[in-house]
A protein has these predicted regions:
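Thiamine diphosphate
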Residues: 1-164, 169, ...
């Protein structure tokens, strides 16, 4: 059996920007002295006149992006999630969100999988922060195919968009030939009748692997890829609640304010069901190899399998 192809979604981001740049001369890319890490350096090599390095000044970068958007161009402001969503939150809120400017934020190195950089750089709060901003679209793609499609969709959408990418190479689970991305539209990857796993980002592949293990125990798990956290596909959540009555959310993010919280909002108001949230449990991360951290914090396939099995039983 051939080995599954793995690509970090930050690589996908860089490649997608180059392809879009060839088609759209109004696309401008900004970075904050991290072009090699965020992979926007790919765009810089091809279109140096449309790449702006703002230096280690993320707040200023967001302000510059807002100004560029005000002229009618489409800026993609890029940095680590900790800096793009954390350090620059005020500027994203007041300079981009409030005036409803057409700025796209490409946030790489999100979540615990940043690895050795440690807790100060492992942003497990960005989804929570960004989804509170009125009008902000929040997208967390699961793999290379989806990430590229998400960047294209973000460009085409008029208004602020937050794109979340990872440092760790993850399995390519979507077929590029027939994949279709739609903002706010979840994708059912596996049918099931006993429990529904709603996952986002790199946790989609982990959840699919967990579902395979559950099947061996005669537990039928539906797996839904919720790539867009905002606007959330409420219809998919309501349907899952009616179908299985048990929902498990899985995210490489704090269980507070992220995908799990968004799903619970819908369940509480529209579709009563039992829900379990799997994610980072109100704690900071630590330095270590990404794969080991994912396992330690209970976000790997084996951990998901064990938690879902106990939840269903």
């Amino acid at each position: 059996m051939s080995e599954v192809k793995k690509i970090a979604t930050r690589e996908s981001y860089g490649n997608a920007l180059v392809e879009l740049g060839k088609e759209h001369e109004d696309l401008v890319v900004l970075d904050a002295d991290l072009a090699e890490a965020t992979k926007t350096g790919m765009f810089k090599k091809v279109f140096p006149e449309r790449h702006i390095d703002c230096g280690i000044a993320e707040c200023n970068m967001i302000g510059v992006a807002a100004g560029i958007a005000a002229t009618g161009k489409v800026p993609f402001a890029s940095s680590f999630a900790m800096f793009a969503a954390g350090r620059a939150f005020e500027q994203v809120r007041n300079s981009v969100g409030y005036p409803k400017l057409n700025v796209k934020i490409g946030a790489t190195h999100a979540g615990i999988s940043v690895g050795e950089d440690g807790a100060t750089h492992q942003c497990n709060e960005d989804i929570a922060l960004m989804r509170t901003i009125p009008g902000m679209i929040v997208i967390n793609p699961s793999d290379d195919v989806e990430a590229k499609a998400a960047v294209k969709a973000a460009y085409e959408h008029v208004g602020p968009v937050y794109l979340r990418f990872g440092r760790l190479a993850v399995p390519v689970i979507n077929d590029n030939a027939d994949y279709k991305f739609e903002i706010g539209k979840a994708i059912t990857l596996r049918e099931g009748t006993d429990v529904t796993i709603i996952a986002t980002g790199l946790e989609v592949s982990e959840s699919l692997a967990a579902a395979e293990k559950l099947a061996a125990d005669e537990i039928s798990a539906e797996v839904i890829n919720m790539h867009t956290i905002k606007p959330l596909d409420e219809a998919a959540v309501v349907a899952a609640a009616a179908k299985t009555g048990k929902i498990v959310t899985v995210e490489e993010h704090s269980v507070i304010g992220g995908l799990g919280s968004a799903v619970c909002d819908v369940v509480a108001e529209k579709a009563p069901a039992k829900v379990m949230k799997i994610g980072v449990n109100d704690t900071f991360g630590e330095s270590g190899p990404a794969v080991e951290l994912i396992k330690k914090y209970g976000l790997d396939a084996d951990s998901i399998y064990a938690k879902v099995k106990a939840f269903v039983k």
